[in-house]
Regions:
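N-terminal [4Fe-4S]-dependent radical SAM core
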Residues: 2-58
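Conserved, mostly hydrophobic/aromatic
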Residues: 15, 44, 161, 191, ...
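Conserved strand-turn element in the central/C-terminal portion of the radical SAM core barrel
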Residues: 89-91, 144-145, 157-183, 201-216, ...
Length: 309
């Protein structure tokens, strides 16, 4: 379907109205701290951490005090949820220690989310006990072909998280010009079957020098149509619809969840994404507000549960 067409605009309008109705016209900004950089042997071709891409040749983790400071800053700036992100090969027990320390420092009702590699039931329970409310996890486009992870392994992690009482957010990503309609439909239906607290669609960011960079990027206009279709397909049982990176067109088309980022970022060759691709909480809020959304204040409404720990 042409991006500039009456039909495309009708789809985006319908998606916007659905999100407005399910979320009460409200939007959220979540904030992620990437706690480490490392050459990752899972070798997701689209990722700046992939060992094959030779962007980060060293392993380095932030000191816990810096992670806590960054999380508290995000909390103070009005982020509705705080995410800790680590590479897939980051030691799980060390990640749990980070999580416990951050959980203790944050307000009791602040939502804490893990964005990490795969884990089993024992790991899911440990995350819950450490104070995490949920996880971000996606079965990415090209999973098993352009990544070193089998799709079933990703699904096993989602199931383990749900059994442990962790809520799951996900997304159809990373969308590139090479992806077919059939691939997008497959991942959209899979997203719906995951029964997430939020869904959406995000484009692949072309990282210079990587194998996929030559394929280019999907335009924000095309992504607005894709995220609108995902929104409608997932249905009214999911109130929040995300896109990344934050942009005005997506917000108009029904995206009501953006991320601010600092620290490491798998779409960024810079070690500190706040100096390059990362958005601030204030900028995300500004884009959403300009698109006519009312901002949620306080803890995330998408992740409506407490945590043990």
């Amino acid at each position: 379907m042409p991006v500039i067409s009456e039909e495309a605009y009708a789809i985006q309008y319908a998606a916007r109205k659905m999100t407005e109705e399910t979320a009460g016209g409200r939007a959220e900004v979540h904030a992620q701290v990437g706690i480490n950089v490392a050459p990752c042997l899972q070798n997701c071709v689209f990722c700046s951490f992939a060992a094959r891409n030779a962007i980060f040749r060293h392993s380095k983790a932030m000191p816990p005090e810096e992670v806590i400071e960054r999380c508290l800053a995000f909390e103070g700036q009005g982020a509705n949820a705080i995410y800790l992100m680590a590479t897939a090969n980051f030691p799980f027990e060390e990640f749990l220690r980070f999580g416990r320390q951050v959980r203790e420092a944050l307000q009791p009702d602040t939502v804490l989310i893990a964005n990490i590699g795969d884990f089993d039931d024992e790991g899911a329970i440990a995350l819950r006990k450490a104070g995490f409310n949920g996880i971000y996890h996606a079965i990415r486009l090209g999973e098993g072909a352009v990544t070193g992870i089998k799709p079933e392994r990703r699904l096993q992690t989602v199931r383990a998280a749900r059994r442990a009482g962790l809520l799951v957010g996900t997304c159809v990503e990373p969308v590139g010009p090479e992806h077919t309609l059939d691939e997008l439909v497959e991942k959209t239906l899979l997203t719906r079957e995951m029964r997430p607290v939020f869904s959406g669609a995000a484009r692949r960011i072309a990282i210079p020098g990587t194998d996929l960079a030559g394929l280019g990027m999907v335009s924000e206009a095309r992504m607005a149509l894709i995220l609108a279709v995902v929104r409608l397909a997932v249905g009214r049982g999911v109130s929040f619809n995300c896109t990344h990176e934050p942009n005005d067109i997506g917000a108009m088309a029904g995206a009501n969840l953006f991320w601010a980022e600092n620290g490491a970022n798998p779409r960024d060759p810079e070690e500190k994404t706040e100096n390059n691709r990362g958005y601030t909480v204030a900028k995300c809020r500004e884009i959403l507000r300009e698109a006519g959304w009312e901002l949620v204040t306080g803890p995330s409404r998408a992740f409506q549960t407490g945590c043990s720990g």
